[in-house]
């Protein structure tokens, strides 16, 4: 009887310590985890793809006639400068640290000179043909004085007017030089400060 009780208590003890068998089944499908390396935390990939578009620098606007008129009047009074002198007007050049309406500047200069009886201006058509003949691009603004003089000689001009805008874009200065085509000598030069258009 004691043996029976002892063996029954051992069986009972072992049964209470045994763990239930683990359930065998198909492993559950979990969503693959993805790590984004393209966009920073908190920003969607669409936002990152769009990016930030930089602002286009603003082109400064000037009333070109205000500084140019007194310069042209001063130039026309140059000693030994005969009326009707043939003049090649070089494109105004931008040597500032900003953007300028250079085409308007050149147009304004030509308009002022055409109303002045001192010079006979070489036409834009003549200038374009001469550039083609000399192998100079039509977009070339004759950035070097020597190139402007060479073109002036080809066109049989007596003078070349070289004009540029320099210094800081907030307070630029317009410079003019009248050069004698025959020698390349600068016979007149002047400059003046410019102001922003209202």
From Swiss-Prot:
GO biological process: peptidoglycan biosynthetic process; regulation of cell shape
GO MF assignments: enzyme regulator activity
Residues with lipid group (S-diacylglycerol cysteine): 17
Claim: Lipoprotein is one of the keywords in the record: yes
Location of region: Disordered: 23-44
InterPro entries attached to this UniProt entry: LpoB
Membrane topology according to the record: Lipid-anchor
An annotated GO cellular component: periplasmic side of cell outer membrane
Record field: compositional bias (Polar residues): 30-44
Signal peptide (UniProt feature, chain positions): 1-16
Major localisation: membrane
A Pfam short name: LpoB
Intracellular or extracellular location(s): Cell outer membrane
Keywords: Cell outer membrane, Cell shape, Lipoprotein, Membrane, Palmitate, Peptidoglycan synthesis, Signal
N-palmitoyl cysteine lipid attachment residues: 17
Similarity comment: Belongs to the LpoB family.
Role: Regulator of peptidoglycan synthesis that is essential for the function of penicillin-binding protein 1B (PBP1b).
Subunit-structure text: Interacts with PBP1b.
Name used for this protein in its record: Penicillin-binding protein activator LpoB
Organism: Hamiltonella defensa subsp. Acyrthosiphon pisum (strain 5AT)
């Amino acid at each position: 009887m004691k043996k029976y009780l002892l063996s029954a208590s051992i069986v009972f003890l072992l049964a209470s310590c045994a763990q239930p068998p683990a359930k065998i089944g198909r492993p559950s499908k979990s969503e693959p985890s993805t790590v984004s390396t393209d966009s920073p935390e908190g920003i969607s990939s669409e936002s990152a793809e769009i990016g930030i578009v930089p602002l286009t620098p603003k082109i400064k606007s000037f009333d070109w006639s205000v500084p140019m008129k007194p310069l042209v009047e001063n130039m026309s009074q140059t000693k030994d400068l005969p009326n009707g002198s043939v003049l090649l007007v070089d494109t105004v050049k931008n040597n500032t640290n900003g953007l300028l309406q250079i085409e308007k500047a050149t147009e304004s200069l030509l308009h002022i000179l055409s109303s002045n009886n001192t010079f006979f201006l070489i036409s834009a058509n003549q200038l374009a043909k001469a550039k083609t003949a000399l192998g100079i691009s039509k977009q070339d603004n004759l950035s070097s004085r020597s190139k402007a003089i060479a073109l002036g000689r080809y066109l049989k001009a007596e003078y070349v007017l070289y004009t540029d805008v320099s210094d800081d874009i907030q307070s630029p200065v317009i410079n003019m030089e009248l050069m004698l085509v025959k020698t390349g000598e600068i016979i007149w030069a002047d400059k003046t400060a410019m102001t922003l258009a209202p």
